[in-house]
Amino acid sequence: MGSGKSSIGKILAKRTSKKFLDIDFQIIKNQGMNISEIFEKYGEEYFRNLEKKELEKLDNIEDYIISTGGGIILKQENIDMMKKIGLILFLDIDINAQLERVKNKKNRPLIDNDNVESSLLALKKYRDPIYNNICDYIIDVSNKEKNVIIKEIEKIIL
């Protein structure tokens, strides 16, 4: 959350002549409501199943840069599918940089707007070990310009 997955993915896809696919955007488009509304109306488990369905559509996909929501790794089936599809890059961000990026955004369903830092710390504590275990590469995006991050990723994927 707040690591720049979507914005970096779009730029990277353009620079590498690959197509870009944002799983969250596909879900929003298909459901006709934003992620916060989906969480509120149907719950997190429903949303995680939507992520799984979107990944299942990508079984034989090539030449794509794919951005996922940060919680996609909470289902083992999603991890297995992502590993089958291609490389998993973890855009890691330190808590201070993350807080700066998301503190004024009120549409994050897993963030308590009255206690943003505690919410982020809890998510990070739970998710980061999973990412560290499953990813092929970790890219620290804390306090870096997008062009620097993209060059780091290009060295890996090209």
Located regions from the model:
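A glycine- and Lys/Arg-enriched "phosphate-lid" helix/loop adjacent to the NTP-binding pocket
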Residues: 85-128
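Walker A/P-loop
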Residues: 6
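ATP-binding Walker
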Residues: 3
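Glycine-rich phosphate-binding loop used to anchor ATP phosphates in small-molecule kinases
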Residues: 46-87, 142
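NTP-dependent small-molecule kinase module
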Residues: 11, 15, 61, 125-158
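Conserved substrate/cofactor phosphate-moiety recognition/catalytic segment
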Residues: 14-53
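Short, structured coil segments at secondary-structure junctions
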Residues: 16, 84-85, 106, 134-135
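Hydrophobic/aromatic beta-strand patches that form the interior of the parallel beta-sheet core
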Residues: 21, 87-89, 137-139
